[in-house]
């Protein structure tokens, strides 16, 4: 990351953002922080996957993080939550036995799946609002709105899946 920053003269905050992302990924399960075992796994992953990763792409493409990116950040964060909850669902039994303190362990897969649908709905609603209320941006938010319907519809179709059946659950998570 440091060599990339030097070679391509990216913004001063490129390397610190990469470092934060790496530290969050490393300390998700590694001591001494062990974020996933202390109830911080979802928020750290949602931030890393929903804000830092798209932020890095945006930063590399545009040379800076500007208001267009920050307008998108709440929706990206919602999809970061969507991501982490989906990947936790098939592993809830192992997480419980391993001592992780995540939302799936605490509240169960049924409520967790409701949170998956909720987070996807929030992401879509944000993109709908951006499409309606912001027209001055160089970004056409309508495309975000259209593509946000894919995980929402797939998730809603999966509402009838027997979440107790691990094979069906894994199939649904792959679809999500």
What are these regions (language model features)?
Residues 132-176:
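Extended hydrophobic alpha-helices typical of membrane-associated regions
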Residues 1-64:
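Intramembrane alpha-helical segments
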Residues 7-22, 26, 91, 136-155:
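Hydrophobic alpha-helical transmembrane segments and immediately flanking/interface helices
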Residues 125-129:
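Transmembrane-helix signature of multi-pass solute transporters
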Residues 19-32, 51, 56, 74-90, ...:
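Transmembrane alpha-helical segments that form the membrane-embedded catalytic/substrate-channel core
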Residues 33-41, 62-68, 89-96, 162-171:
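A cytosolic-side transmembrane-helix exit/cap motif
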Residues 12-19, 43-44, 69-74, 113-117, ...:
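Hydrophobic alpha-helical transmembrane segments
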Residues 1-3, 77-124:
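Solvent-exposed interhelical
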């Amino acid at each position: 990351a440091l060599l990339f920053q030097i070679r391509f003269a990216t913004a001063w905050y490129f390397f610190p953002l990469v470092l934060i992302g790496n530290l969050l990924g490393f300390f998700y399960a590694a001591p001494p922080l062990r974020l996933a075992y202390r109830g911080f796994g979802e928020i750290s992953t949602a931030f890393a996957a929903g804000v830092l990763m798209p932020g890095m792409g945006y930063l590399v493409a545009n040379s800076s993080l500007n208001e267009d990116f920050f307008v998108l950040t709440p929706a990206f964060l919602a999809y970061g939550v969507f991501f982490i909850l989906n990947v936790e669902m098939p592993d809830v039994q192992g997480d419980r036995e391993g001592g992780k303190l995540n939302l799936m362990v605490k509240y169960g897969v049924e409520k967790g799946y409701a949170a998956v649908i909720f987070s996807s709905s929030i992401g879509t609603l944000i993109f709908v609002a951006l499409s309606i209320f912001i027209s001055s941006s160089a970004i056409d938010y309508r495309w975000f709105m259209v593509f946000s319907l894919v995980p929402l519809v797939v998730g809603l179709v999966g509402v009838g899946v027997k979440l107790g059946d691990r094979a069906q659950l894994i199939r649904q998570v792959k679809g999500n």
